[in-house]
């Protein structure tokens, strides 16, 4: 009896699949949305197509405020620290901006120019206040810069009093 039921289910499924395939093949219409001329320029006549560079896009229009500066554009300081200290990067009297490799860099936080130009922090170290420190084990910079552990606590794996 079980063998007969398996045969009956198999025949029913085969019939359903066959009917589905036949109906989809006969009722499907292929619609194409191709243009008559795919290379035809669809811009209105008389318009000038110009793609300006990012430097031209920063140009100030007459009677308007200057556009926002492109954040990807490099500041070329050409070994002149005054450009970096007087620029928009400066954050007050204790600003630590300097010209490193023809770019303005913050010597207090940059891992590749920590304290001095081209002073790279080692693996696992972070530049905090111009010094390379291991934030995983430093009590004064536990887990992040300027996160001090309380008196008597140790910094382990970047957490004060771990375990």
Swiss-Prot record:
Ranges in coiled-coil conformation: none
Protein name (database record): Stigma-specific STIG1-like protein 2
Entry keyword Glycosyltransferase: no
Leader peptide range in chain numbering: 1-20
Key word Coiled coil present: no
Protein family per UniProt: Belongs to the STIG1 family.
Domain of life (superkingdom): Eukaryota
Pfam families reported for this sequence: Stig1
UniProt keyword terms in alphabetical order: Signal
């Amino acid at each position: 009896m079980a063998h007969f039921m398996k045969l009956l289910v198999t025949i029913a499924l085969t019939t359903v699949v066959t009917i589905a395939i036949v109906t989809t093949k006969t009722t499907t219409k292929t619609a194409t949305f191709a243009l008559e001329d795919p290379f035809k320029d669809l811009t209105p006549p008389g318009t000038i197509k110009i793609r300006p560079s990012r430097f031209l896009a920063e140009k100030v229009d007459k009677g308007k405020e200057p556009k926002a500066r492109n954040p990807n554009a490099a500041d070329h300081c050409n070994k002149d620290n005054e450009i970096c200290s007087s620029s928009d990067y400066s954050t007050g009297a204790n600003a630590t901006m300097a010209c490193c490799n023809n770019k303005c860099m913050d010597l207090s936080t940059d891992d590749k120019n920590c304290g001095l130009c081209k002073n790279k922090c080692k693996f696992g170290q972070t530049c905090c206040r111009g010094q390379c420190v291991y934030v995983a084990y430093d009590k004064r910079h536990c887990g992040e810069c300027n996160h001090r552990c309380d008196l008597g606590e140790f910094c382990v794996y970047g957490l004060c009093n771990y375990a």
